[in-house]
């Protein structure tokens, strides 16, 4: 079916779904939330669940034969294997902790893989009214305006974004803080804003120069952002310098000029 449908049609459907879910997020942002715990610091709200339903219903109406992977359905029913079939991979509310605290760095993330390749990406922050889109070989955009990664070529001039994840065992926390400590001597500054998808979009539009995350939640965190970064001229890779593998939950992104320097700095900080 994917071979007979223009990618622009997939994009339009994803944008529609993201905006519908985004309206629910926007309305829920300013009211008291009913919060559940998936882990010590990993939260989920009724908004996460209702937004996933909205998105999947919208997508399934148009593409009933496609496959679907979502953060909340995966948490409830277990992982779904990624195949070569057209597959929609959805995080209905990336940045749930931010949402709960009223910090406006939240988004809907909708990605489509075809042949396991991220092909269409939509990331929508309804609080800041920013819509990032990308289609393979067709460019990346913020609210319809073309975007491009930065041109920084020295680490000392770079802004690095990362996340600390949700694991709080001592070995993970020590490794995370030691790594950040080492990298902080190499770059201009470091930011942690609480949304992997929006971190990737920050690389795509040049707000930040480097991004990495060890142990992100799942493919729903990165699929859409990968398309947007690559279409904005950026590169996606494993922080070790190896090729990116979506099943390993390690990701890095940058402009092509700074990748090698970052990989070397990352190895030294490990």
Swiss-Prot record:
Responsible for the provision of inositol required for synthesis of phosphatidylinositol and polyphosphoinositides. Inhibited by Li(+). Its EC number is 3.1.3.25. Keywords: Hydrolase, Lithium, Magnesium, Metal-binding. Transmembrane segments: none annotated. Its cofactor is Mg(2+). Belongs to the inositol monophosphatase superfamily. Signal peptide: none annotated. The gene is IMP1. SUPFAM superfamilies: Carbohydrate phosphatase. Mg(2+) 2 binds at residues 91, 94, 221. Pathway: Polyol metabolism; myo-inositol biosynthesis; myo-inositol from D-glucose 6-phosphate: step 2/2. Substrate binds at residues 71, 93-96, 194-196, 213, 221. One of its GO terms (biological process) is signal transduction. It is an enzyme of class 3 (hydrolase). GO terms for molecular function: inositol monophosphate 1-phosphatase activity; metal ion binding. It comes from Mesembryanthemum crystallinum (Common ice plant). Pfam families: Inositol_P. It catalyses: a myo-inositol phosphate + H2O = myo-inositol + phosphate. This is Inositol monophosphatase. PANTHER family: INOSITOL MONOPHOSPHATASE (PTHR20854), INOSITOL-1-MONOPHOSPHATASE-RELATED (PTHR20854:SF4). Mg(2+) 1 binds at residues 71, 91, 93.
